[in-house]
Structures are given as structure tokens and as C-alpha cells.
């Protein structure tokens, strides 16, 4: 019996080796087959002009390339997808500008009573929703098509935590003041600024991302300290808005080491807040000379 098994060993080994080789060859063929597939999809993408079709096809490409990529490559793949989506959604907003301008007319009568949108309107909107888009009411009667979180969620979950946090900061900073009217509360704006500062402190090695966050951070800080055209920080006599003053005091107490706290302390010493130009110039001066990582990053732009 032993001699029988001994005589079979070389055959079994050869058989197993053949299986391994066959499997490897099949795997190699599948891999080789995937590359032309992606190339053909990229070529097809270059020929497409319809924004929705381009988004759909780019998503197919991302699905094929994301899984085998390194974390850094995944970030690059995702950014390419997000950039394309942003461009195509911009085209859609132009194409649907007339519809978006009348968005509320389809939902309210002349007396501002809610009405049921026509079936054609429902079908139009459903078509966009099914493709991963949504209608954002950004304030001041402005409605825009935008990517729904679900469009990116699957891919974001495959990215490093530092990148997910960076992405969320960008999203939360979008359209905070449509038509120069702040849609966040002063406290919400202050907390968003703190998140930017905390991100820089927690991820000191992400200097490339700091460069991308720098403009947003400066803008948020400017709005928080000097307001906007339609959300002023003071009344006509130059007296600081009581709600904002209370928020500044809360901010100072909660975040004593923040750069923004230094600005608040200086601004609270003012007797009058009518000269916004002087305040904005002072803030710009501080931002240009500060060694805060998010402000230093702006020098590399």
C-alpha cells in the first residue's frame, strides 16, 4: 500500500502544480483582460457629451480600478471622479437653469400654499435622484443640483480617515452664504472654523491638503469676524450684534488657544464696528503674517 502511494506522489505533485499554473494563467488573463476594458471605457468617456452619461461611465471606471489600488491611488482615483462630477453637475445646472429658477413655483401657488408638483416635474426630478443627484435649497430662493452623499459614500469608505475628514470639511463649507446671506448660525460657523483648526493640528503631515483648505479657512474666518453684505455684524450705528458678541465670548472660553480667539480679543476692544474695511484689512494682515499651518499653506498656492 505504501509503495502504491509513494509511486503516486510524483503524479499528484505534477497534477497540483498544473492546477496552480492553470489558476495563475487564468488570473493573469483576467487581469490582462481588465486593462483593455478600462482603456475602452476611458475612450468611450472621452467621446460622451451628456453629463449624466459621463458620470455613470466614470463611476464604472472607478468601480473597476478602486479595489486593487493603494490608499494613495484611491485618493487620486476618487478626486478624479469628484472633479468630473463637479464639472458635469455644473453643466447640468446651466442646462436646467430655467427649471431651477422656477423650482418653487412648481410647489407653491401665488398665495404661498403648498401644491403637488405636476407628474412631469416629479419624473424629471426622479431621473436625477436615481442617478445620484439631489436638489439643494441653499437659501435666498436659490436651488441647485448637487451630488447626493450616496454618490460618493461607497468610495469614501475605502479612503484613509484623514481624507474622509478633509472631504467633509469641504462639503460643510459649501454655499454657506448664497447671495451674501449667511445660512449658518454664528455658532455653527464658529464650530466649523474650529474643525478646520483641529484638522490641521491632528494631521500635521497633510500639507498638500492644507493648501486646498487654506482659502476656505480664510474665508470662513473673514465671515465670522466681519460678516457679509446681507448678514452684518453690527447695526447702522455700529454697535456689535448682541448674538455675535455672545458667540465670540463663548468661542474665546471654549477655544483659548485658537488663532481666531486672538482676533476676537482684538476686535472686542473696538468701540464701533462701522468701518468694515479697516477690520477686513486688519484680518487680512493677520492672516498673511500668521504661522498657522492653514495660513502658511496659502503661500504655496
What do the PLM-derived regions correspond to, one by one?
Residues 150-158, 199-211, 251-262:
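Short solvent-exposed coil/turn linkers within tandem alpha-helical repeat scaffolds
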Residues 26-29:
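Bacterial signal peptide processing site
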Residues 1-8:
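N-terminal secretory signal peptides that target proteins for export/translocation
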Residues 9-16:
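Sec-dependent signal peptide recognition
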Residues 22-24:
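C-terminal motif of bacterial Sec signal peptides marking the signal peptidase cleavage site
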Residues 222-226, 234-301:
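A cross-kingdom marker for long, charged
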Residues 106-124, 139, 146-148, 156-190, ...:
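Short coil/linker segments at helix-helix boundaries
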Residues 33-145:
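N-terminal Sec/ER secretory leader and immediately downstream segment
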Amino acid at each position: 500500500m505504501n509503495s502504491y502511494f509513494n509511486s503516486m506522489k510524483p503524479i499528484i505533485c505534477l497534477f497540483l502544480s498544473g492546477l496552480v499554473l492553470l489558476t495563475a494563467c487564468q488570473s493573469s488573463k483576467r487581469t490582462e483582460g481588465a486593462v483593455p476594458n478600462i482603456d475602452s471605457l476611458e475612450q468611450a468617456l472621452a467621446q460622451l457629451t451628456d453629463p449624466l452619461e459621463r458620470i455613470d461611465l466614470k463611476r464604472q471606471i472607478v468601480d473597476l480600478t478602486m479595489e486593487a489600488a493603494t490608499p494613495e491611488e484611491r485618493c487620486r482615483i476618487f478626486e478624479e471622479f469628484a472633479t468630473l462630477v463637479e464639472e458635469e453637475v455644473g453643466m447640468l445646472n446651466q442646462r436646467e437653469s430655467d427649471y431651477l429658477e422656477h423650482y418653487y413655483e412648481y410647489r407653491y401657488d401665488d398665495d404661498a400654499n403648498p401644491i403637488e408638483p405636476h407628474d412631469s416635474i416629479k419624473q424629471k426630478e426622479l431621473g436625477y435622484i436615481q442617478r445620484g443627484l439631489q436638489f439643494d435649497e441653499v437659501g435666498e430662493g436659490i436651488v441647485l443640483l448637487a451630488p447626493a452623499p450616496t454618490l460618493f459614500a461607497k468610495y469614501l469608505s475605502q479612503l484613509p480617515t484623514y481624507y474622509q475628514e478633509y472631504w467633509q470639511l469641504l462639503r460643510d463649507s459649501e454655499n454657506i452664504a448664497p447671495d451674501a446671506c449667511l445660512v449658518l448660525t454664528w455658532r455653527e460657523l464658529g464650530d466649523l472654523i474650529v474643525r478646520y483648526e483641529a484638522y490641521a493640528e491632528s494631521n500635521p503631515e497633510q500639507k498638500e491638503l492644507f493648501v486646498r483648505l487654506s482659502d476656505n479657512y480664510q474665508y470662513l474666518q473673514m465671515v465670522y469676524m466681519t460678516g457679509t453684505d446681507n448678514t452684518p455684524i453690527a447695526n447702522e450705528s455700529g454697535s456689535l450684534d448682541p448674538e455675535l458678541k455672545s458667540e465670540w465670548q463663548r468661542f474665546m472660553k471654549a477655544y483659548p488657544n485658537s488663532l481666531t480667539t486672538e482676533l476676537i480679543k482684538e476686535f472686542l476692544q473696538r468701540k464701533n464696528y462701522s468701518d468694515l474695511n479697516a477690520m477686513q484689512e486688519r484680518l487680512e494682515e493677520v492672516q498673511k503674517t500668521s504661522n498657522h499651518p492653514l495660513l502658511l499653506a496659502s503661500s504655496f498656492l
